[in-house]
Amino acid sequence: MKFIILGFFLLSSMYAQEIKDHSFENGKIIYQQTCVSCHGKSGSTNPYMQLVVKPRKLSKTILTQEQSFQITKEGAHFWGAHSDLMPTFKYVFTDSELEDVSYYIAKAFNPDREKKIQKLLDESDSISKEDQSKMLKTGEKIFNRNCSMCHGMSGNGQSEYVEQSKAQKNFIYPYDLRRTLLTEEQIFLYAKYGGKYWGTMKDDMPSWKNKYDDFILKSVAKYVNEKIKTVK
């Protein structure tokens, strides 16, 4: 009986691996036929592309595999981007095909993402129970004083500063945070380390770790996640 169970387990494992291998290869084919022209063979993007907003480096993305799938399916604009550079592909490929692409990107370009993010979270300051009760109020204060200059008071990515940047031909495209896919932890890490650390080609979203401590940045992330973000 033990041999039968062991044999079944081995066959199941082999079948599961075969499915993963097929998903990887199919995702690779689609990526090379469709995505490579913007994101490059290694997912690091061609920095010489003549675009106002250049594609992100997939090798540094903060996104999970599921989040990458959602971005690819619906397009970046659906999830808060004010640039339509990353279009929707749901009318071109099936969900299964887009899941294969996301799987390929995760395994080929960013296999250590989870370890990297967990390490950064483990190294961040923990928040005491006493301070946790102050987070939303603190986050709102800092957001209104600092983040709203680009993202707007409501977090919609529209502000006077953004309009001035257009007039000066120095375009910036703050996200509509009401629709962001990022979790509270991801928002914290994105604010702490800045956009370039996570693969953007411009530094419109700077690192705030030298100005604010982890308590303040985690408070802002909590405020955005609970009070601004409308897509859960």
Please tell me what each predicted stretch does.
Residues 15-30, 46, 112-142:
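Electrostatic cytochrome c docking/interface patches
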